[in-house]
């Protein structure tokens, strides 16, 4: 929101801009999304526990810590009722701040954003109908809008993040793992996992 006081910000969403991605985008002057973009997810994220999987492989995890709650979000053990209560309080505060920031960025009421939140995901078209994004379009349309807002007739330079070696390797492996794609593994693991975490943390 501070950047909007000194410059124009236009967001172009591609395949996915959900949860933290939408949190960041919500402060822009204008948001463009593709019809099939996955966005929204103002709310919850499931948290995986790996202790059973590691146990089946004969792997045991030992934790050394200083502080009673230092490993409260450990992936390798179940949380205690006391930890659940503490974490839920923190997450509720984070969730409320998330909703309030989106409402402020999108110039909507908190109640209207709450009605769209609770972790729901939306396609680009659904997000447009619910005023979570401003226009259906891609990078070309977003750049045209940025030029208009800035009253700039020249060519806008593009700076794209270079893929890391890990990203390239992951893409190569993904193309050869049709039946074991990352998406299938991701959703299979999440299917029976408890909802423990609301993301993202507040962005300052």
From Swiss-Prot:
InterPro entries in alphabetical order: ClpP/crotonase-like_dom_sf, Pept_S49_SppA, Peptidase_S49, S49_SppA_C
Active site: 19 (nucleophile), 70 (proton donor/acceptor)
Gene3D superfamilies in the cross-refs: 2-enoyl-CoA Hydratase, Chain A, domain 1 (3.90.226.10), 6.20.330.10
Gene Ontology molecular-function annotations: serine-type peptidase activity
Keywords, sorted A to Z: Hydrolase, Protease, Serine protease, Signal
UniProt entry tagged with the keyword Signal: yes
Signal sequence range: 1-27
Xref: CDD domains: S49_Sppa_N_C
SUPFAM superfamilies associated with the record: ClpP/crotonase
A Gene Ontology BP annotation from the UniProt entry: proteolysis
Enzyme Commission number: 3.4.21.-
Family: Belongs to the peptidase S49 family.
Protein function: Possible protease. May be involved in export of periplasmic flagella proteins.
NCBIfam families, sorted: SppA_dom (TIGR00706)
Name assigned to this protein: Putative peptidase PfaP
Phylogenetic classification of the source organism: Bacteria, Pseudomonadati, Spirochaetota, Spirochaetia, Leptospirales
Gene of this entry: pfaP
């Amino acid at each position: 929101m501070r950047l909007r006081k000194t410059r124009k910000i236009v967001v172009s969403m591609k395949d996915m801009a959900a949860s933290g991605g939408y949190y960041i985008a919500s402060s822009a002057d204008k948001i463009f999304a593709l019809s099939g973009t996955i966005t929204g997810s103002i709310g919850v994220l499931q948290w995986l526990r790996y202790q059973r999987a590691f146990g089946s492989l004969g792997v045991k995890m030992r934790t050394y810590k200083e502080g009673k709650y230092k490993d409260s979000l450990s992936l390798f053990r179940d949380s205690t009722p006391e930890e659940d209560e503490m974490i839920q309080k923190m997450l509720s505060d984070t969730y409320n701040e998330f909703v309030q920031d989106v409402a402020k960025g999108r110039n909507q009421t908190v109640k209207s954003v709450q009605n769209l939140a609770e972790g729901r995901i939306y396609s680009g078209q659904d997000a447009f109908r619910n005023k979570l994004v401003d226009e259906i379009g891609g990078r070309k349309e977003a750049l045209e809008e940025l030029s208009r807002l800035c009253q700039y007739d020249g060519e806008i330079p593009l700076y794209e993040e270079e893929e890391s070696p890990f990203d390239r390797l992951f893409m190569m492996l993904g193309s050869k793992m049709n039946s074991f794609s990352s998406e299938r593994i991701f959703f299979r693991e999440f299917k029976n996992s408890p909802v423990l975490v609301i993301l993202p943390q507040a962005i300052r």
